Amino acid sequence: MLPSRKTKRVFSCDFTPGRKRRRCVVVPSSVSPVPENTTGADLLDSIPDDLVISILCKLGSTSRCPADFINVLLTCKRLKGLAMNPIVLSRLSPKAIAVKAHNWSEYSHRFLKRCVDAGSLEACYTLGMIRFYCLQNRGNGASLMAKAAISSHAPALYSLAVIQFNGSGGSKNDKDLRAGVALCARAAFLGHVDALRELGHCLQDGYGVPQNVSEGRRFLVQANARELAAVLSSGIQARSTWLSLSQPPPPVVPNHGQQTCPLLSDFGCNVPAPETHPANRFLADWFAVRGGDCPGDGLRLCSHAGCGRPETRKHEFRRCSVCGVVNYCSRACQALDWKLRHKMDCAPVQRWLEEGDGGEGNVQIDGNGNGDNVLLPMS
C-alpha cells in the first residue's frame, strides 16, 4: 500500500478572524426574560413612606425659600403626593410658605388654605394677616390669627394686640386697651421682641395698665438685649457699621468706683434691622404695588418699613407730633423706625395740628433721645 501523500497548504496574506458558533439556550416558556435596566435601580422605591415623610418634614421645617419645597413637588409623582401630606404641610417653615404679593393667585390662596387645614400655625397667621388687611375680610382674618394665638403663636398674639390697641376693623370706640395689654404680655412671655417693647411702653406710660416706670424700663432693656442676641446668634460677622455707637459718646463723669453698664436703648447700639416676617413683607409689597404709601380712601400705611399694616379707618394710627409726616401702628414700630431712619429725618414744623388733620389726639412727651417716648395717646 502506497503511503499517502501530504499536500501543502497555501495561506494568503489576508487574515480572517474566526467566528464562534452561537450557543442556543432554551428558555422555559413560564419564565419571562428580565428587561435590561439602563438607568440603574431606583432606591427611592425601596424607602418606606413613613421615612420619606419624616425626611420631608425636616426639609420643610428648615426651608429657606418656597423653591426648596416646590422643587420636591416637581421631582416625581410619589414625592409630590407625600409632600402634600398634612403632617408635612403642618410643619412648613415661614419662609417655605412666603408668598410674593405680585405672585398672589387663587392657587397660592388654596395652598395656604390647605396648610391651614393641616394645622400649620404659620399658615394661619400669614393667611389671617392677608385676609384681614389685604382682602379686607376682617372677621375671617381675625379668626385665623386667633386660631394661631390659641396655640401660643407669638406673632399672632402680638398682631391681635395691635388690633385691640387701635380698634382695627371697627371704630375708635372699639379699642380695648386691657385686652391689648393682656395679649401683648402673653407674646412677650414667649419672647417676642416687639411685644416686649410694646409692653414696656405701656407700663412706662400707664397705657391700659397701671403705670410702673421701672418695670417698663426693664422690658425695654430686655427687648434690646434679645434684639442684639438674635443678631449675634445669626452668624452675621462683626462690622463697624453696627458695632459702633450711633450717637457720640457721653461726657466722662466720675462714677466714684461704681461699675456702669450703658443701656442699648439709651446709647443706640447700631445693630442690623431685624428680619421682616414674610407676612409683613407681603403686606408691604401688596400695598406698594397698589398705590404706595396710601392704600386709598385717605388711609395711611405704617411708616416702619418692616410692618406693612394699613389703617382700616382714617386717623387710626399715631402720628409723630414733631414733624407730622410719619405714622405708626404701634410704639414698637415707632421705636424701631426712629432708630433705623426717622431720627435723621425728623424736623419740627409750624404747628401741623392746626391743619385739622391731627389724628386721634396724639401728643409728644419728653423722651430720652432714642424714640422710646415720642408718641402718647391722650385717651
Curated annotation (Swiss-Prot):
Associated pathway: Protein modification; protein ubiquitination
One GO CC annotation: nucleus
Positions that bind Zn(2+) 1: H304, C307, C329, C333
Keyword Cell inner membrane: no
Major localization class: nucleus
Keyword Metal-binding: yes
Positions annotated to bind Zn(2+) 2: C320, C323, H342, C346
Subcellular location: Nucleus
SUPFAM superfamilies to which the protein is assigned, alphabetical: F-box domain, HCP-like, HIT/MYND zinc finger-like
Domains: entry comment: The F-box is necessary for the interaction with ASK proteins.
UniProt name for this protein: F-box protein At1g67340
Organism: Arabidopsis thaliana
